[in-house]
Amino acid sequence: MIGREQQGKNVIVRATLLLFIIMGFFSMMAYLHTYNTPAQLLHLPIVINTWTFINATRVAYRTMQSGGVTERIALDGIEKGCNWCEAHPDHCDFTVGYGGSPNEWGQTTLDAMVMWGPTREVGAVGYMKRVKPAISVARKVMERTYHTILVGDEATTFAVEMGFEEEDLNTTRTAEMWREWKAAGRKPNFWKGPHNSTQGVTKRKEMNEKPEFGRWNHDTIGMVAIDQQGNVACGVSSNGATWKIPGRVGDAPIVGSGAYCENEVGGAAETGDGDVMMRFSPSNRVVQMMKGGMHPKEACERMVAEILRYYPNCSGAIIAVNKQGQIGAAYMNLPNGFPFCLQNSNMKDAAIITIKD
């Protein structure tokens, strides 16, 4: 028989354990409330995207305000917003969609990616030809396959199987650009050192004059959205670098590089010299810094500083938004600063914000 003293000790132990369990439960609830509760979020829905593509911002925001097309409202906003640029490349600097950024063979190819924060699902296409709504095909990869990325002609074949129409991505504009580039000695380009062409033209030596990054020749629309329920989505669409070597896939469809989001934290997207940017997974890194409590602005600035340590001439920018609705952006080696677009429920219309030193 257990003595009264031992019984008393057992009661104390059980009471202490119960107290720890109760305290742990309420601590967990407080953590979840702080991190996830939509009531604490500011001015939802919210959309941010790179550059001055403000009509894409408006379309994304209106899509989310209207309730979206599916239950994945933030993802609907991302898709429809980027679709606008893909269908109107003349309003998005010809750096998104058809009719821009031809490669060495004069072809326009497309890269795109979408990510759904609640489940971390991702779909992407790279070096896709002859299909215009690249981000919609990327979403089909996410929702209709177990894969993450499809590339090249096989991505086109998949798109056609999903009901998308094959169309020529080249235009009279890109054909003229290509003719002028060839007449100028096929410079600039992305080769290092002397190179012998396999295309039947004369030997090309000292062809390593890499194109300078700029808004007009090497760009991306990267977008992050948070809907009224607090769900986060992100996406990217691009026609890549002008005069890229055929077969090149840029940073846009690479998850963690072109864009990245987590439902508990927020999201980020980048634009710039993709061949350098993708080496750092900058969007993922910024989200992880925000996850550790860092303000989006500081996270973007730290990421840019790290890239510059290794590539001091790299040009580009990063945008980010956290679940509290705080916005951040940073850029490098852009002489005129960096513009991005924002719209939330506290604004009458979308706005272009330009950051400068």
Outline where the language-model segments fall.
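Short, low-complexity, Lys/Arg-enriched N-terminal segments of secretory-pathway carbohydrate enzymes
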Residues: M1-N10
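Alpha/propeptide regions of enzymes that mature by internal proteolysis
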Residues: I12-D357
